[in-house]
UniProtKB/Swiss-Prot annotation:
This is 26S rRNA (cytosine-C(5))-methyltransferase nsun-1. The gene is nsun-1. GO terms for biological process: cuticle development; gonad morphogenesis; maturation of LSU-rRNA; negative regulation of cellular response to heat; negative regulation of locomotion involved in locomotory behavior; positive regulation of egg-laying behavior; positive regulation of fertilization; positive regulation of multicellular organism growth. Keywords: Methyltransferase, Nucleus, Ribosome biogenesis, RNA-binding, rRNA processing, S-adenosyl-L-methionine, Transferase. GO terms for molecular function: RNA binding; rRNA (cytosine-C5-)-methyltransferase activity. It comes from Caenorhabditis elegans. Its EC number is 2.1.1.-. Residues 1-105, 513-664 are annotated as: Disordered. Its main location: nucleus. The keyword S-adenosyl-L-methionine applies. It catalyses: a cytidine in 26S rRNA + S-adenosyl-L-methionine = a 5-methylcytidine in 26S rRNA + S-adenosyl-L-homocysteine + H(+). Methyltransferase which methylates the carbon-5 position of cytosine 2982 to 5-methylcytosine (m5C2982) in 26S rRNA. May play a role in the translation of leucine and proline codons. May be required for the translation of specific mRNAs such as mRNAs involved in gonad development, collagen production and cuticle integrity. Plays a role in ensuring the correct localization of the germline-specific protein gld-1 during development. Not required for pre-rRNA processing, the production of mature 5S, 5.8S, 18S or 26S rRNAs or global translation. Plays a role in positively regulating fertility.
Length: 664
């Protein structure tokens, strides 16, 4: 008994250490377990008492390791130890999932993903609340403060954050605005910050803000202008197929892939171990280094073998060689450029690429309408422009282009497009098409020029046949263009990952030139004006007749005497004058009717009145109280200017002298 008292404190720990022996006793056959000694019964009772005390003193985790159930016959079947069959059954059907070690690996991964997802959601909510708090405290600086800040070196991080804040405010202006600030204030601050961040002048930044009212899209466009486009090449179908060229270049150490689904000759170069412009394939004329945007106007032109084609601004010859490849070196192709030094580049590229149906010209584009009017089936005009679509190639465009430069380009483009259309043959069996393109995104150089052509010539816009691109503008701020301009295509670097570009395809309807305003519009205006004139004339006649009737009835009272109306007096004086001055009015007879006849009558009537005034005048003109001799009235010669030029100045002087003598 004394030994039992000593072990009373460590009974729970002893039960845990004797766990394997108890487990073996549970698994023994029934024959062995039936023989239970009294000592073992006493030991079980003591273990129960110690377990109760341990349950009161120790944590719950240690108590769960030993569970005793009373009222068992043998005293051992009520014991449930870890690893027993009863515990396995309890774990399988229990809702208690505190034991994480029993989960399958896929369940553990799923739980980890759920925790990670909850963490991300919580972080996003915290960030959202933080942004809302920052937006609530955002204060818009004045333009003067920003200008003072720009005088020194600006902190680009602060400027970038302010741009983001202003764009967010403009996106939800009603709820986030400062009541004391207008939208113009926010836009002005945004414009100043964008100019400071990206290095543009005010004019270009204003144009881009008009093109992209959405602030997020504007930032994407500005970022794309600072990043170069992928290097692309065009396979020369006159010498090699694109598939064979790609294999050869891959063997050279170049990583190339087909550029896009809409082109069959384009390849994009991701990286290269050799210079792209110095491979044997390049020197042999198997490909041309060319941007994907320059493939679009040639695809829209769609030249056919045997056509007469003009590339009005062709340097350095990429589009010209592409046209020759589509024509299969047949027909006649004129490659023109106004710059003589650039014509040398055209000749070199055409020789290298194997083009032999081309005539290289060095003329101004405006001269072709005089040299070969109606002489081409198809014309490509890639007009000189401001280059706002390829800013990544020339960063000086950001500051060098202003309103005057764009206006000069606009005027030149209008002259070139008129000359190009006049050089087209509208009666060509499969031609009469003009493709106008620029590497600019400004409306003044694109839609405005094409709309000008539609108003001046017999032509119409047709679909370009290109599967990609954004439709052109029909309404842009103060501009209102022809609805068919929606068939033109625009390309942006941040949308299509190519240089900014514009393509329009025009069909010539007639070789006859329209008037300045346009024949169709002029006829409509004439009809409208004619109907309006008739209406006004009818209203005037009705009002005059009503006035005459009132004057006839009422007359005019002067000094209490009723006199005839003014119009009646004029008619009476006119009739009296006609009767008395038959000799003076004799030359006015049988002149005829019409505007010229009326003019002659008026001139002759004035001359007769002057003659009558000379007869009645005493020859003096009173100025104040002094009489001055009045010069005799000199009459101009009745001889027209052209007749006077034929007869000479002497005959005119003689006639004037004779007329003065007759008057005296």
């Amino acid at each position: 008994m004394a030994i039992v008292k000593k072990k009373k404190v460590s009974a729970a720990s002893k039960a845990a250490t004797e766990k394997p022996e108890v487990k073996k006793a549970v698994k023994r056959p029934v024959a062995e377990t039936e023989a239970v000694t009294p000592k073992k019964k006493k030991l079980v009772k003591k273990v129960k008492k110690s377990a109760k005390k341990a349950h009161e003193e120790e944590p719950i985790e240690q108590v769960e390791k030993l569970q005793l159930i009373d009222d068992d016959e043998d005293g051992l079947e009520g014991l449930s130890f870890p690893g027993s069959d009863d515990e396995d059954l309890r774990d399988d059907y229990s809702d208690d999932d505190s034991d994480a070690g029993d989960h399958l690996p896929i369940e553990k991964k799923s739980a980890a993903l759920d925790k990670q997802k909850e963490k991300i959601i919580a972080e996003g909510e915290e960030e959202l609340q933080l942004n809302i708090a920052n937006q609530a405290t955002f204060e818009l600086p004045t333009v003067e403060e920003i200008e003072n800040e720009m005088k020194s070196v600006p902190n680009l991080e602060i400027v970038k954050q302010r741009i983001a804040d202003v764009i967010q405010v403009l996106g939800d202006f009603k709820n986030r605005r400062d009541p004391q600030k207008s939208r113009e204030n926010y836009v002005e601050v945004l414009k100043k910050d964008l100019c400071s961040q990206y290095g543009y002048n005010d004019y270009l930044m204003g144009k881009f803000m008009d093109l992209f009212p959405n602030g997020a899209e504007l930032l994407e466009f500005l970022e794309a202008n600072d990043n170069p486009r992928p290097v692309t090449i065009r396979a020369n179908s006159l010498k090699v197929k694109r598939r064979d060229l790609a294999k050869n270049l891959i063997n050279r150490g170049m990583n190339v892939d087909p550029a896009a689904d809409w082109t069959k000759v384009g390849l994009v170069v991701y990286d290269s171990q050799v210079p792209v412009g110095a491979t044997p394939e390049y020197l042999a004329g198997h490909y041309m280094i060319q941007g994907l945007n320059s493939l679009l106007p040639v695809m829209a032109l769609a030249p056919q073998p045997g056509d007469r084609v003009l590339d009005m601004c062709s340097a350095p010859g990429g589009k010209t060689s592409h046209i020759a490849a589509l024509m299969k070196n047949s027909g006649v192709l004129f490659a023109n450029d106004a710059n003589f030094t650039r014509c040398r580049a055209i000749i070199g590229n055409l020789h290298r690429l194997g083009v032999n149906n081309t005539v290289v010209c060095n003329l101004g584009g405006e001269e072709f309408s005089k040299i070969r009017p109606n002489g081409f089936d198809r014309i490509l005009l890639d007009a000189p422009c401001s280059g706002t679509g390829v800013i990544w190639k020339d960063q000086s465009v950001k500051t060098s282009k202003d309103s005057q430069d764009v206006q000069r380009r606009h005027t030149m483009q209008r002259q070139l497009i008129l000359s190009a259309l006049d050089s087209l043959d509208a009666n060509s069996p499969n031609g009469g098409y003009l493709v106008y393109s620029t590497c600019s995104v400004l409306v003044e150089e694109n839609e405005a020029v094409v709309n000008f052509l539609l108003e001046r010539r017999h032509c119409e816009l047709v679909p370009t046949g290109l599967s990609i691109g954004v439709d052109g503008y029909t309404r842009f701020r103060d501009y209102r263009f022809h609805p068919s301009l929606s068939m033109t295509k625009r390309y942006y670097p941040h949308v299509h990952n190519i240089d900014g570009f514009y393509v329009a395809k025009i069909k010539k309807l007639s070789n006859a030139k329209m008037s300045k305003q346009g024949v169709m519009e002029k006829e409509k205006e004439k009809a409208a004006q004619k109907s309006q004139n008739k209406k006004n004339k009818a209203e005037a006649e009705a009002s005059e007749s009503s006035d005459d009737e009132e004057e006839k009835k009422n007359g005019v009272e002067v000094n209490g005497q009723k006199k005839p109306a003014k119009k009646q007096q004029q008619k009476k004086q006119k009739a009296d004058g006609d009767d008395s001055d038959d000799d003076n009015n004799a030359p006015m007879k049988n002149i005829g009717s019409g505007a010229r006849a009326n003019k002659k009558r008026r001139n002759q009537k004035k001359a007769a009145e002057k003659q009558a005034a000379v007869k009645e005048d005493d020859g003096f003109n009173t100025v104040g109280n002094v009489k001055r001799a009045k010069k005799p009235t000199q009459f101009k010669s009745k001889v027209p200017k052209r007749a006077a030029a034929r007869t000479g100045a002497k005959s005119v002087k003689n006639r004037r002298k004779k007329m003065l003598a007759k008057q005296q």
